Every structure is written in C-alpha cells, then in structure tokens.
Amino acid sequence: MTFIIAVVGATGNQGGSVARSLVQNPSFSVRAITRSPDSQASRSLLSAGAEVVKADGFNGEEMLAAFQGAWGAFVNLNSDDPIWRQPGGPTEFDLGKTIVDAAAGAGVKHLVFSSGPPCVEMTGGKVNMKAMEMKYKIEQYARKLGSFETLTPINPAWYLENFLAEEVAPIFGGFPYFPDEEGYLTFRVPHWAGPGGDNRVPFLGIRDDFGDIIHGIFLNPERYNGRVIHGVSQLRGFDELVADFEQVTGKKCRYEPVLPSWEAFDIHGIPELEDVKLMFAFTQTTGGRYFAPEPSEADTAAELKRTTAVALGKPEPEQHTLRTKDFFRKHFATEK
C-alpha cells in the first residue's frame, strides 16, 4: 500500500527538496500541488515520478480537490511573495488558513507545516519578524483546529544555499565571493547572540537534508506529533564557518561582527532582507535561541536524516546531515 503525500510549494526550495526525497520511497506517492504545472520545476518533478496537480492556494475548492485521498501533506508558503506588500491585499495567514482548512476538509491525517518561531512571544514584544510571526500564527490555527491525527511544525534554519547567491554577497561583506581591500573574504554580520549567549548558528542544507528530515517525520508521524522540529544540518559559529571555508579553499577569510548591535547592519533598503536584519535583533534578544524558547539542537534532525537514509538503503556515509565544510567543498573547492 502506498500513501499519498501532497506537497504544497513543491516547486520551491523546501517543497522541491521534500518531493525529491519522498519519490525515492515506494511506500509514498508524491502529489506536487502548484499554480504552474507547466513550469520547468513542475516538469522536473513529473519526470522524477511525482504527480503534478494544478491548484491555487487562495481557492479553497481547488485545494480541497487537490488534497483528496492524501494521507499526509507538507505545506510551505512563500513569505517573499510581493503580494503580501500590497496595501489592502491578502495576508500570508489568509493563504495558510485556506490551505489548512482544505487539507482538513479532505481528511488529510498527517500535516507537516513549515513554520517559524514565536518571535513576539519570545522577545516580550520587542521583535516582530512578520514572516515568521505569520507562519507561527498559521501553525497555531492548525493546532487549534484539531482535525489532524498528527501535526508537526518544522522551523528551517539559515540556508547554506544562501551563500551561492553571489549578488547579495556584498551586503554581507563580500564573503564568499569578493575580497575586501585587504584581500580577505570578509563575512560581516552582527553577532548571533552576543556575550553570554549561544553563538552557534543553525545552518541547513536545504537540498541535501531538508527533504530527508521531512521524509523521516512521515515515516513515523506519531512520534513527532506536536513537536517543533529544528530544521538544521549543523550548529556552527560564524568564526568557525569562515574557518571551514578557508581550510577548504585556501583563501584568506575572516569574520567581522557588525557593532555595536544588529541595528548597525545595513541592508541597503532591500525589503526581502528586512526580516534578516530583524533575525539578528531576535537572536540577540533571546541569547541565540532561534527555533523556540528551548536551546537549538541538531540531534533530532540528524536522527530523522538517518532514519530516511536507512529506509532508502543508503550507505553509512550518506546517513549524516551536511557539514558546512562539506558544503563549501562541494561548491567552492577547486579540487573536489
């Protein structure tokens, strides 16, 4: 017997990783739900073995039909969609509520939702990352609905793949592409936590690990019911991160903290980076805790990755979450 898992946001970074992992398991049948079934990303999923279904997340009837017969669902929403910045337009909560209601109405048993930390609650109202707060609000709505046998929120960490975006590297000091005037690849961002806090930063290999982590949840959804999963590959300090890059590439690197606080971080008026700046406000206020009031941990994600790898019959070296050093070796080393 195969179990249908619907993936909302299947053509994005998160959903694509989930779909690519799940299609490898004959116990699961992947249904990719998208507004653009003719896109290259949709065609790639189709070629990989997924079913591709057209549905608009704002259309409750279309989503209800798309979820019919699904045993499980993974849902991620695009917080960077320009539609959220339109005055008087819909909110991300509106979209999330419609999708969650449709999944519940179709009888989906197991929901995994890509959520965010309760930043307002965790900072006593000092910091409001709009995207994260909206996701958390949707998560709470889904919990209170009480229609799913299991509901597991996952909070994704800092994508390692962000370091592949050469165009934004200058905002972060030039690392890992553009040397400064002294010849260093300088990573210039605020401290993660500051003195006395946990300055280990959660990094995530979205392509290598995220889909396998979600896959692992669906292999045993009851075990992870209600738990906030920390979507992380490795916890690594900024100084350790640049040291890893230097060791792999042989290029001079350094980490220079933006001082005196997150407020001095210049994002050059780019709206999509406003929440990145506020992320540092958040973690400096919480002492480095990003996912929840509890300390960040990588063991659960590593366990889920291993569970998936074993289920797929992968060898031991492929059963571990990605290390930052291996990510840099894969993408930046001249000799791989």
From Swiss-Prot:
Gene3D superfamilies: NAD(P)-binding Rossmann-like Domain, UDP-galactose 4-epimerase, domain 1. InterPro entries: NAD(P)-bd_dom_sf (IPR036291), NmrA-like (IPR008030), NmrA-like_oxidored (IPR051164). Keywords: NADP, Oxidoreductase. The keyword Transmembrane does not apply. One of its GO terms (cellular component) is nucleus. It catalyses: 4-{[(2S,5S)-5-[(4-hydroxyphenyl)methyl]-2,5-dihydropyrazin-2-yl]methyl}phenol + 2 NADPH + 2 H(+) = (S,S)-2,5-di-(p-hydroxybenzyl)piperazine + 2 NADP(+). Pathway: Secondary metabolite biosynthesis. NADP(+) binds at K135. Its EC number is 1.5.1.-. Pfam families: NmrA. It is an enzyme of class 1 (oxidoreductase). Coiled coil: none annotated. NmrA-like family domain-containing oxidoreductase; part of the gene cluster that mediates the biosynthesis of the alkaloid (-)-FR901483, a potent immunosuppressant that shows efficacy in animal models and a probable inhibitor of purine nucleotide biosynthesis by targeting phosphoribosylpyrophosphate amidotransferase (PPAT). Within the pathway, FrzB catalyzes the reduction of 4-{[(2S,5S)-5-[(4-hydroxyphenyl)methyl]-2,5-dihydropyrazin-2-yl]methyl}phenol to produce the (S,S)-dityrosyl-piperazine intermediate. Belongs to the NmrA-type oxidoreductase family. PANTHER family: NITROGEN METABOLITE REPRESSION PROTEIN NMRA FAMILY MEMBER, NMRA LIKE REDOX SENSOR 1-RELATED. This is NmrA-like family domain-containing oxidoreductase FrzB. It comes from Cladobotryum sp.
